[in-house]
């Protein structure tokens, strides 16, 4: 880690922008989704929980594009690491990127659009929590797929800055999950409890 830090200028504007977007994005969608779950104000404003969810998803996607752009610019503005600048490392990065894409896309198809973009906070619930691939091989595959994408991208660019930012991506997801997992579990517990009472 100390060796990586020697390549990184933490005051570089591109690096600062990447750090801000990486940490802001999960905070944004968690705060907005919980506020919606508590107040239903977005659903009322848009006249439908589906429209509200889709509108939030647009902002999340735009923020994710911005995060990826800032991540890439931060890598390009700082030195490459010679020991990573090899065909073998590039191939490893490409494989990680491919794995990440598979996890992200398969998660999206398993969850559906609303499920991917916090639909459960809008009252758009599935019959039960999703357990098909890739959820049957690991928890939170969307987040780990995204992390693999960034890790692969960083290795392909032989970028110590990218590796450090990937660690930050993983840490922000871990912190987000500390809030999201119990909350989602409680939403589905309440749904199951309500179903039992009606039956």
Swiss-Prot record:
Localized where? Answer: Endoplasmic reticulum
Q: Name one GO biological process term.
A: sphingomyelin biosynthetic process
Q: Which domain of life is it from?
A: Eukaryota
InterPro entries associated with the record? PEMT/MFAP, Phopholipid_MeTrfase
Post-translational note: Isoform 2 is N-glycosylated with high-mannose oligosaccharides.
Q: What's one GO MF term for it? A: phosphatidylethanolamine N-methyltransferase activity
Query: Which keywords has UniProt assigned to this entry?
Result: Endoplasmic reticulum, Lipid biosynthesis, Lipid metabolism, Membrane, Methyltransferase, Mitochondrion, Phospholipid biosynthesis, Phospholipid metabolism, S-adenosyl-L-methionine, Transferase, Transmembrane, Transmembrane helix
Annotated residues that bind S-adenosyl-L-methionine are located at 98-100, 180-181
Q: GO CC terms on record? A: cytosol; endoplasmic reticulum; endoplasmic reticulum membrane; intracellular membrane-bounded organelle; mitochondrial membrane; mitochondrion
| Tissue expression notes | Primarily expressed in liver (at protein level).
Q: Which Gene3D superfamilies match?
A: 1.20.120.1630
Q: Which residues lie on this side of the membrane: Lumenal?
A: 1-12, 34-45, 115-157
Q: In which pathway does it act?
A: Phospholipid metabolism; phosphatidylcholine biosynthesis
Q: What is its EC number?
A: 2.1.1.17, 2.1.1.71
Q: Intramembrane: which ranges? A: 13-33
Q: How is its activity regulated?
A: The first methylation is rate-limiting.
Q: Which residues lie on this side of the membrane: Cytoplasmic?
A: 67-93, 179-199
Q: Which reaction does it catalyse?
A: 1,2-di-(9Z-octadecenoyl)-sn-glycero-3-phosphoethanolamine + S-adenosyl-L-methionine = 1,2-di-(9Z-octadecenoyl)-sn-glycero-3-phospho-N-methylethanolamine + S-adenosyl-L-homocysteine + H(+); 1,2-di-(9Z-octadecenoyl)-sn-glycero-3-phospho-N-methylethanolamine + S-adenosyl-L-methionine = 1,2-di-(9Z-octadecenoyl)-sn-glycero-3-phospho-N,N-dimethylethanolamine + S-adenosyl-L-homocysteine + H(+); 1,2-di-(9Z-octadecenoyl)-sn-glycero-3-phospho-N,N-dimethylethanolamine + S-adenosyl-L-methionine = 1,2-di-(9Z-octadecenoyl)-sn-glycero-3-phosphocholine + S-adenosyl-L-homocysteine + H(+); 1,2-di-(9Z,12Z-octadecadienoyl)-sn-glycero-3-phosphoethanolamine + S-adenosyl-L-methionine = 1,2-di-(9Z,12Z-octadecadienoyl)-sn-glycero-3-phospho-N-methylethanolamine + S-adenosyl-L-homocysteine + H(+)
| HAMAP family from the UniProt entry | PLMT
Q: What the protein does?
A: Catalyzes the three sequential steps of the methylation pathway for the biosynthesis of phosphatidylcholine, a critical and essential component for membrane structure.
Family of the protein in this entry: Belongs to the class VI-like SAM-binding methyltransferase superfamily. PEMT/PEM2 methyltransferase family.
Recorded protein name is Phosphatidylethanolamine N-methyltransferase
- The protein's organism comes out as Homo sapiens
